[in-house]
Amino acid sequence: MAEKKLIAILQRHGSTLLNENNSFRSRMDPPLDKQGISQAEKAAENILNEGFKVKKIISSPLLRAVQTADIIADELGLDVEQNRGLISWDLGFLSGKNKDEYDEILNYFVDNPKSKVPEGESLDDLEARTFEFFNEEMKNDDLKVYVTHTSNVITVENLIHGNHDGRPESGETSVEPGGTVGVYVDSEGKYSTEVLFGVEEDATFGS
């Protein structure tokens, strides 16, 4: 079996009230709730105790991600850099809507990745900026923690597996709020992901 190296840590932000309400978060900007703060603190503890040689923490500019990143940064003694390359998929008019009630509408835009969500962006837009961001990031070997959102984690998975048809139905890795996913590359140049910490859940867009 080819040896593999951890090259990136994808950290999902902690939970917010909108998570509890089963709403599409997208570009809405709620703070972490009490559970979300605890999840971020646990993630920070896990990353520290594992002894990962983290050089930098980069966060989506949305508050829930920045708060998560700040908690981890305090534990690791690092600063946080914000980058819009990690911001959530802009779901436009779907933002704040209940997932169960609007799931079929979201799936239309997932199944038709070139179609822009009204007042938002297309899935292709999300994939393009995610690829551009990580393509630039992978030009150096520093291990970094990227604090981001479910849709971004799924998009990284899709890029790794060459799945460009939208639906995350190929066994992609996703975790509950506060969970941590590792991105690896082996000696043959093959990329993979695995859950480092947290509870795995079905991968669904819209977080």
What are these regions (language model features)?
Residues 17, 64-66, 88, 152-155:
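Short, active-site-adjacent cap segments at secondary-structure transitions
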Residues 59-60, 128, 147-148:
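Short beta-strand scaffold positions
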Residues 51-85, 107, 158-161, 184-207:
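Conserved histidine-centered catalytic loops in small-molecule metabolism enzymes
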Residues 31, 74-131, 206:
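Phosphate-handling substructures
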Residues 50-53, 137-143:
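Glycine-rich phosphate-binding loop signature in dinucleotide/nucleotide-binding domains
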